[in-house]
Curated annotation (Swiss-Prot):
Name assigned to this protein: tRNA N6-adenosine threonylcarbamoyltransferase
Record function comment: Required for the formation of a threonylcarbamoyl group on adenosine at position 37 (t(6)A37) in tRNAs that read codons beginning with adenine. Is involved in the transfer of the threonylcarbamoyl moiety of threonylcarbamoyl-AMP (TC-AMP) to the N6 group of A37, together with TsaE and TsaB. TsaD likely plays a direct catalytic role in this reaction.
Species name: Synechococcus sp. (strain CC9902)
Compartments in which it is found: Cytoplasm
InterPro entries tied to this protein: ATPase_NBD, Gcp-like_dom, KAE1/TsaD, Peptidase_M22_CS, TsaD
Similarity comment text for this entry: Belongs to the KAE1 / TsaD family.
Binding positions (Fe cation): 116, 120, 312
Superkingdom: Bacteria
Length: 357
């Protein structure tokens, strides 16, 4: 059984975890800790990179000690140390990367630099039953909205993406517009529960093809954001209080509709009978229920990352590292740095002898 210490500091969550492969190939989380900075960044209406980096430096050492103590393991007993190295905030990424490399070198164990999105894809393995490839992944988070096909040998192919705002980013911006605070996803979900999702008609943004028609699997949320602004302005011009619950519910519903419709269509068009949903927005209850309902109607088996592992965490980074180890990847180059941007399709380059960055 292989065991990994994993570190995650790509944005505003400091996290450490110890995970291992069990005899049946499933992933067991021995310990997982997260230090959130949400309340501090909420004062600024979003993540402040310099503050995030400083808080990671302060929080990560204690988190590492806690997960090692809880798992009753020393670093020398591990098969590897893993850390997110791309993509994310460069200064924040450096904290986990430098910490992980240092610990690995001191204790003479391999180091694995992990792609953050590969971690999100692996988060589905932290549930009761890990999906077996091939399958389609809907990755929907604050920075990414993508449809990715995972092949039999773990190869990844992007089939759809957002051309502007990610879904999670749209939640944050609309929440700010409605005065609901940060982060937007939980804030909108909380007030939308009591709202009428059919009160306001909002657009389902599409991406035009050069030869005519629309891309069936791509996303656009900028037009929806503009439509929400105009709807709010129209309500304000009528006087009285804003119907916040109805606005939030209408917005939440159209985002869920778009994500589910295009994901299910993509799965069916590519003869994929499994669809996995991961990322922070996958925690949205309306989206989870709609995806499960539509999957059942169309004969597509739906797997959703456990709520505890939808948002950024180190357990998913550990799960991705275990996947790499099981495929014979032993180490990243000691010279590899971090990258604020790095496409998931080029994740294999993180393990080359000659570093990609």
């Amino acid at each position: 059984m292989q065991t990994v210490l994993a570190l995650e500091t790509s944005c505003d969550e400091s996290a450490a975890a110890v995970v291992r492969h069990k005899a049946d190939g499933s992933v067991e989380v021995l310990a997982s800790r997260i230090a959130s900075q949400v309340e501090e960044h909420a004062l600024w209406g979003g993540v402040v990179p310099e503050i995030a980096s400083r808080r990671h430096v302060e929080a990560l050492p204690a988190l590492v000690q806690e997960v090692l103590r809880e798992s009753a393991l020393s670093i020398s007993e591990l098969n590897a140390v893993a850390a997110t190295v791309a993509p994310g905030l460069a200064g924040a990424l450096m904290v986990a990367s430098v910490t992980g490399r240092t610990l690995a070198a001191l204790h003479q164990v391999p180091f694995l630099g992990i792609h953050h999105l590969e971690g999100h894809l692996a988060s589905a393995a932290l549930g009761e039953q890990a999906p077996a490839p091939p399958y389609l992944v809907l990755l929907v988070s604050g920075g990414h909205t993508e449809l990715i096909r995972v092949g039999l040998n773990g190869e990844m192919e992007r089939l759809g993406r957002s051309h502007d705002d990610a879904a999670g980013e749209a939640f944050d911006k609309v929440a700010r517009l409605l005065g609901l605070g940060y982060p937007g996803g939980p804030a909108i979900q909380a007030i939308a529960v009591s709202g009428n999702a059919k009160r306001f008609s909002l657009p389902k943004g599409r991406i035009s093809l050069r030869g005519g028609g629309f891309h069936p699997y791509d996303f656009s949320f900028s037009g929806l954001k503009t439509a929400m602004l105009r709807t709010v302005e129209s309500c304000q011009s009528s006087g009285g209080d804003l119907p916040l619950a109805d606005l939030a519910a209408s917005f939440e519903q159209v985002v869920a509709d778009v994500l589910v419709e295009r994901a299910i269509r993509c799965a069916l068009d590519h003869n994929l009978t499994q669809l996995v949903m991961v990322g922070g927005v996958a925690a949205n209850q309306r989206l989870r229920l709609l995806m499960a309902k539509q999957g059942k109607q169309h004969g597509v088996a739906i797997s959703i990352a456990p709520l505890a592992y939808c948002t950024d965490n180190a357990a998913m980074i550990g799960a991705a590292a275990l996947n790499r180890l099981s495929r014979g990847v032993l180490s990243s180059s000691d010279e590899t740095g971090v990258a604020a941007r790095w496409p998931l399709e080029r994740a294999d380059a993180l393990y080359d002898a000659s570093p990609a960055f």
